[in-house]
A protein has these predicted regions:
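DEDD superfamily 3′-5′ metal-dependent exonuclease/proofreading module
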Residues: 2-7, 20, 156, 160, ...
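Metal-dependent nuclease catalytic cores that hydrolyze phosphodiester bonds in DNA/RNA
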Residues: 1-146
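Mg2+/Mn2+-dependent nuclease catalytic core
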Residues: 134-239
């Protein structure tokens, strides 16, 4: 990662060539993780998270694939791999969030080195990032769903929802459809609450520091927004 260079101008400031611009006054919603599936407190209601809806509407095929993997390597080993990946992802997100906000973050523990290098790899591939509107942005679509997206920004001149992902191995596009659904859900909520989004981007770094970028054009985003509405409808039908 480059040495952070900050230049302040009125209410915004520039870091390494991109501008932090508080264009929107983003609110925040508290998250509930301890009483069943994840929800967010939106006004006076508990609203299901995007990941809760995705999990509840998984296809039987995807559920079988996950269960077969657990059975093949053993449930204890599967839990260890899952927990390691979650810890690595959390640390990587901390580094990226602080960098995008013009702050420093450094975990000197053994579990901080690899995620920091992964975050640096992602940052070094953000040459088309020109503005940051917000990080860890809380979004809700009325009382239908809520969640937090990693980054709302201007990328390659277009208002963009971006998500950072860690991975144990390189991804094929057919493996990341749930990521497309997440971007679509956040895009719809942002349009409803704040302003236009015309593309999505998923930025992945593996534990071996392989970088991948998956772009969602305006057309692909619109396609998955429609598909997301269908998933939400299915979720609420199942919940009755």
């Amino acid at each position: 990662m480059r040495v952070m260079r900050i230049k302040r101008t009125d209410s915004s400031f520039t870091i390494d060539g991109f501008r932090i611009n508080p264009k929107y006054r983003y609110g925040s919603y508290t998250r509930n993780d301890n009483d069943g599936p994840r929800t967010y407190n939106v006004k006076d209601r508990k609203v299901p998270s995007v990941t809760t809806i995705l999990s509840a509407t998984q296809s039987p095929e995807k559920k079988r694939t996950l269960e077969n993997w657990r059975n093949r390597i053993g449930h204890e080993e599967a839990a260890r791999i899952t927990n390691q990946a979650a810890t690595r992802g959390t640390e990587m997100h901390y580094v990226l969030e602080h960098y995008m906000n013009g702050q420093g973050y450094l975990n000197l523990g053994d579990n901080g080195v690899q995620p920091r290098m992964m975050a640096h790899t992602i940052v070094d591939n953000l040459e088309k990032l020109s503005e940051v509107y917000g990080t860890e942005v809380s979004l809700a679509y009325e009382d239908q769903w809520a969640g937090s997206t990693d980054l709302v920004c201007v990328y390659d001149g277009k208002p963009t929802i971006a998500d950072f992902k860690q991975s144990n191995k390189p991804k094929r596009e057919e493996w990341i459809e749930d990521y497309y659904y997440q971007i679509a859900a956040y895009s719809l909520a942002h349009k409803k609450q704040y302003g236009e989004i015309t593309q999505g981007i998923i930025l992945i770094c593996t534990k071996d520091l392989l970088f991948q970028k998956f772009m969602m054009s305006e057309q692909l985003l619109a396609k998955y927004e429609e598909k997301w509405f269908a998933r939400v409808e299915d979720y609420y039908k199942r919940s009755k």
